[in-house]
């Protein structure tokens, strides 16, 4: 049964060409918002906390600080409203899910930049 679900996802779900990113990376997600008849593009820039799931049901969580309040947003990878994703900075973290990042403030909340080869 799982192979049938995977086959349908691979064949019929549209794949977007999105860059590869992982936990610790700082990315900007540009997505479309519909307000009545108008549509506008809004962006959300923050640190990737986690990537979860596989295939077409994959999601990722981004966290940013808005003043002194932390804001997290979960995006499905195949959300039709996503226009593009930019990687601003590659971060070097040891874990795939950096939930400990929620409790850090100030200079402790910095992520070391990864060395690109």
From Swiss-Prot:
Classification of source organism: Bacteria, Pseudomonadati, Bacteroidota, Flavobacteriia, Flavobacteriales
NCBIfam families in alphabetical order: rplS_bact
Role played: This protein is located at the 30S-50S ribosomal subunit interface and may play a role in the structure and function of the aminoacyl-tRNA binding site.
Keywords assigned: Ribonucleoprotein, Ribosomal protein
Identification of the protein by name: Large ribosomal subunit protein bL19
Source organism of this protein record: Christiangramia forsetii (strain DSM 17595 / CGMCC 1.15422 / KT0803)
Gene Ontology terms: cellular component: cytosolic large ribosomal subunit
A molecular-function term among this protein's GO annotations: structural constituent of ribosome
A GO BP entry: translation
Family, per entry: Belongs to the bacterial ribosomal protein bL19 family.
SUPFAM superfamilies for the chain: Translation proteins SH3-like domain
């Amino acid at each position: 049964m799982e192979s049938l679900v995977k086959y349908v996802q691979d064949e019929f779900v549209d794949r977007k060409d999105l860059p590869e990113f992982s936990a610790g990376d700082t990315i900007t997600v540009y997505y479309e918002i519909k307000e009545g008849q108008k549509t506008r593009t809004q962006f959300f820039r923050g640190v990737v906390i986690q990537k979860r799931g596989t295939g077409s049901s994959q999601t990722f969580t981004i966290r940013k600080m808005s003043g002194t309040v932390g804001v997290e947003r979960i995006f499905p990878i195949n959300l039709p409203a996503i226009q593009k994703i930019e990687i601003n900075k590659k971060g070097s973290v040891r874990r795939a899910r950096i939930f400990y990042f929620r409790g850090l403030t100030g200079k402790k909340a910095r992520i070391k930049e990864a060395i690109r080869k």
